[in-house]
Amino acid sequence: MSDSVEMFTDGACKGNPGPGGWGVLMIYKGVEKELWGGERETTNNRMELMAAIQGLMSLKRECEVVLTTDSQYVMKGINEWMVNWKKRGWKTAAKEPVKNADLWQQLDEQVNRHKVTWKWVRGHIGHPGNERADQLANRGVDEVRAQR
């Protein structure tokens, strides 16, 4: 696995729930690729998850990925909560169904295809990769709104 990909992901939602978008900036050997999309009725957390899922799904072969997100929800889910959710059959400690379990399961499947290193960055402080992902997520929102 010598292919190393830098990936920056972000989600956006206008209203929560409301129209939302996700964005991904990938950099591989100096070449950039942008991905974005959106949904008419969603939440910010779902769009944060979707950005990571779509970015990882777009990779054609097993890669080393450094995935940077500004989402504490994604970071805590992947690094702290998911292992116990899986042990409990996708239930929380309170025995409630995990919110967004459909997307967490997709993310788990994609993470297992690659060697992913997760990084968190504070949002909206001028980090270039994160700012680009944010712009792409907002493009996703704008395109969904334009379809109405």
Swiss-Prot record:
It catalyses: Endonucleolytic cleavage to 5'-phosphomonoester. Mg(2+) 1 binds at D10, E48, D70. One of its GO terms (molecular function) is RNA-DNA hybrid ribonuclease activity. One of its GO terms (cellular component) is cytoplasm. The keyword Magnesium applies. Monomer. Binds 1 Mg(2+) ion per subunit. May bind a second metal ion at a regulatory site, or after substrate binding. This is Ribonuclease HI. It is found in: Cytoplasm. PROSITE patterns: RNASE_H_1. It comes from Pseudomonas putida (strain ATCC 47054 / DSM 6125 / CFBP 8728 / NCIMB 11950 / KT2440). CDD domains: RNase_HI_prokaryote_like. Its EC number is 3.1.26.4. It is an enzyme of class 3 (hydrolase). Its cofactor is Mg(2+). Belongs to the RNase H family. Keywords: Cytoplasm, Endonuclease, Hydrolase, Magnesium, Metal-binding, Nuclease. GO terms for biological process: DNA replication, removal of RNA primer. Residues 1-142 form the RNase H type-1 domain. It comes from the Bacteria. Mg(2+) 2 binds at D10, D134. Endonuclease that specifically degrades the RNA of RNA-DNA hybrids.
